[in-house]
Amino acid sequence: MNYFSTRDHQHIVSAAQAIACGLAPDGGLFVPETLPEVSAQQLQALCGMTYQQRAVEIMRPFLSEFSDEELTHFTAAAYGSQFDDAAVAPLRRLDDTTAFLELWHGPTCAFKDMALQILPYLLTASLKKCGEQRQVCILVATSGDTGKAALQGFADVPGTKILVFYPYSGVSEIQRLQMVTQTGSNVAVSAVRGNFDDAQTGVKQIFGDKAFADALSQRGWFLSSANSINWGRLLPQIVYYFSAYCDAVNGGMIAMGDELNFVVPTGNFGDILAGWYAKQMGLPVGKLVCASNANNVLTDFIHTGTYDKNRPFHTTASPSMDILVSSNLERLLYSLCGSDTEVAGYMQQLREQGRYTVSDALLAKISETFAGGFCNDIQTREKIGRAWRDHRYLIDTHTAVAYHVLDEYRRETGDAAPAVVVSTASPFKFCDQVLRGIGGTADAFGPELIRRLTCETQIDAPAPLTGLDARPVRFGGCVDQSQMLHTVDEFLK
């Protein structure tokens, strides 16, 4: 399986090269030349497998340079005892037609673990397959969860360093503490004055600086990404859509072959894009419902075909979705229109004007699979309260956004098909909002809120989140976007 850039289909690379580079030299994103088909017989076979085995089966055709032995080792190591549920990504039924896919049982209590626990194995193996002699520095811009998951995955991995940038005042206190207390001799963390888009733009500019790349190469370094712009991040996410479907069949929620809707809280469009790839591979997915918070640029795009980032930026109760530039949308546009020239034009308009409008034909294709909705913080807390009162089920703010959007989608469309809400984070990562949602008092700070939520609900907090206030803070720096390149340069000296 080869890959090429969304902005130049003549730039062809292997899977190992795509994972090692992260971002194409022209600024585009790598996409597979074809999508393998999963037959009904293969899907039935997946139902009898463990999560680790399902991961090997789904990823194998995308990684033709990797042996089954390698993939089996990678998945066993990535999805092992560091997950506190043997199912890895368990499906929890709420009622006859609604289930929650819990993707937060890993070491950082967020769905990013599903990809970032295996990415270090894929990346280090890819570097060897490419004959790369230089060391790699992983650059990450995070809206909260990716940063900690990437730090945890790459901490003390030989031949690597990792530097994470997060928006100052743009993550929860628990997310911040998780990052700034990270252990490891090869890690660093810095806040950026601004929002996530400022941090992400800064990282992209560093990747696009050829003179800086040449200077680093002279010193034996090159840069790569652990954000979902890297295909090695996105590929493992396809797996859990297949796994959720199999678990829905095994649990009697649906029959084999029935369509299943998925509702996905997303900001950068990577999580829901993985679901779209799964559908294209043959998974019986009905609608993919994109759930946004007040930064509803994706909802507007799905409804109108116009992507316009020229709007106020809102800091919300679901900070991991506080994003106005959704990088992975570029992959969907390429896959649907098939023209690198057209996609490059859209991306140029976005850079220069902050907006673009797709053709009516392209919007019609998008609307065949995607629906969209959004909710505000008050509605988010109301949904947290409803899930707790009616079902004694505790959900975080991002999951609550998706739960609200599902109810609105069903009410507006009459589509009562079984649906899975993708639950992306432990409720204990956003204790203040969760406490307010269930009627508790949130007049405390950070780890004290974890203890208070445990007391209020009689649910134990995940082990990785306990004792954060007792860990030494290692990283306290804050820089402007213009200083990010200098920060990377100093880190690699």
Question: Where are the predicted features?
Answer:
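PLP-dependent amino-acid enzyme catalytic core
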Residues: 1-493
